[in-house]
């Protein structure tokens, strides 16, 4: 029963990731990222209760602080500091329908790969493990397909969430220090990327990647 819930929550992760990718503006993307992070916290807590790994319960707590609270706060603050720019609703390079199809293919490929892996977790949590692997490609799709450079930050966040779930599934008893390292790395990366985006906005008053091809270091 426990792993069934984990797999269901894994399914919700890919749904929320898709919504982040196809969101039309930054505010909606932030809200969907918060929802995904809450699902991630629930997945970690459920997996911890199922496996008896107390470490995962601690992971769930730290994930709530970093992913549900801190990262959205940093992104929202950066967005407001720029005055909520009008081009925050730039259309993506891919239409939503195409993005959904690409994500579906990525999940299917990862599912096919995971079914060939002979690990205990792969046998009981195949969907969740496949989805965690797929998040790397979903994040990459987000980065490549978005014209809005702030929206591209979410691609990194999705990739990081996927690696988080993969580690939890494959090494549920890993020391808490590993989780702290992952979370700290993610927070500082988001802070740095947000600062860079704000500097670009201050200099060019545009978040459109197509307007930034002439930038020089």
Give the positions of each predicted feature.
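Alpha-helical transmembrane segments of multi-pass membrane proteins predominantly involved
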Residues: 1-217
């Amino acid at each position: 029963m426990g792993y069934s819930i984990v797999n269901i929550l894994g399914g919700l992760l890919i749904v929320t990731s898709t919504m982040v990718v196809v969101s039309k503006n930054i505010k909606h993307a932030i809200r969907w990222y918060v929802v995904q992070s809450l699902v991630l916290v629930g997945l970690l807590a459920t997996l911890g209760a199922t496996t008896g790994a107390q470490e995962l319960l601690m992971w769930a707590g730290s994930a709530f602080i970093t992913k549900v609270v801190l990262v959205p706060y940093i992104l929202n603050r950066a967005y407001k500091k720029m005055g909520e720019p009008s081009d925050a609703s730039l259309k993506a390079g891919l239409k939503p329908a195409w993005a959904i199809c690409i994500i579906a293919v990525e999940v299917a490929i990862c599912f096919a790969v995971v079914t060939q892996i002979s690990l205990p977790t792969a046998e009981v949590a195949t969907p969740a493990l496949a989805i965690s692997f797929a998040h790397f490609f979903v994040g990459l799709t987000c980065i490549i397909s978005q014209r809005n450079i702030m929206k591209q930050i979410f691609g990194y966040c999705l990739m990081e969430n996927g690696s988080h779930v993969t580690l939890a599934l494959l090494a549920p008893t890993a020391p808490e220090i590993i989780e702290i390292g992952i979370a700290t790395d993610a927070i500082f990366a988001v802070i740095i990327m947000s600062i860079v985006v704000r500097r670009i906005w201050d200099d060019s008053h545009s978040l459109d990647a197509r307007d930034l091809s002439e930038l020089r270091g």
